[in-house]
């Protein structure tokens, strides 16, 4: 197994660090050749419109979507979740990969100054994770499993088949529970 981390923009170094700690083969994905070498992909947090522009300019956008639709496991954090969604409520014309049947609203938990940490349940354990200009999942389709919610009831982690996403940034905590789950996605 080789995990790729889309490394065009955003918090990709932090994901690479977690994968190193887990002794997992991993590479940065910046080109189509890089993408062809991976069996899983992480799309990091960052700025979703910048990430969209860079994936289109690099020629990776359609290739990433094709690989996901062919069954490659993928995990998107924050902006990565926006990229994977089917609809962005506050930017209805924003192009997405449309691989995860959810609607999202960008920056729904507030601006940078409103960033916060919260304890969430994730697979029978409690983890404390940061929400930084985080998107909110406003609607989920059939076949989308909820993995985690805030106390308010807001859904903050989901999975649909080979695709998972979180509104939060587990890569910034040093904990590896979410990444470990992703590494087993599709193997169960």
Curated annotation (Swiss-Prot):
**Do you know which CDD domains this protein is assigned to?**
GATase1_PB
- Family designation: Belongs to the glutaminase PdxT/SNO family.
Q: Annotated pathway, please?
A: Cofactor biosynthesis; pyridoxal 5'-phosphate biosynthesis
Give GO MF terms, alphabetically.
glutaminase activity; pyridoxal 5'-phosphate synthase (glutamine hydrolysing) activity
Q: Tell me, what is an example of a GO biological process annotation in this record?
A: pyridoxine metabolic process
What this protein is reported to do is described as: Catalyzes the hydrolysis of glutamine to glutamate and ammonia as part of the biosynthesis of pyridoxal 5'-phosphate. The resulting ammonia molecule is channeled to the active site of PdxS.
Where along this sequence does the record place binding of L-glutamine? 46-48, 106, 132-133
User: What Pfam families has UniProt attached to this entry?
Assistant: SNO (PF01174)
Query: Quaternary structure?
Result: In the presence of PdxS, forms a dodecamer of heterodimers. Only shows activity in the heterodimer.
Q: Which reaction does it catalyse?
A: aldehydo-D-ribose 5-phosphate + D-glyceraldehyde 3-phosphate + L-glutamine = pyridoxal 5'-phosphate + L-glutamate + phosphate + 3 H2O + H(+); L-glutamine + H2O = L-glutamate + NH4(+)
Tree of life domain: Bacteria
Q: Name one GO cellular component term.
A: glutaminase complex
Q: Which UniProt keywords apply?
A: Glutamine amidotransferase, Hydrolase, Lyase, Pyridoxal phosphate
Give the E.C. number(s).
4.3.3.6, 3.5.1.2
Q: Which residues form the active site?
A: 78 (nucleophile), 169 (charge relay system), 171 (charge relay system)
Q: Which InterPro entries match?
A: Class_I_gatase-like, PdxT/SNO, PdxT/SNO_CS
Task: Please verify whether the record's keywords include ATP-binding.
Answer: no
Protein name in the entry: Pyridoxal 5'-phosphate synthase subunit PdxT
Instruction: Please list the disulfide bridges.
Output: none
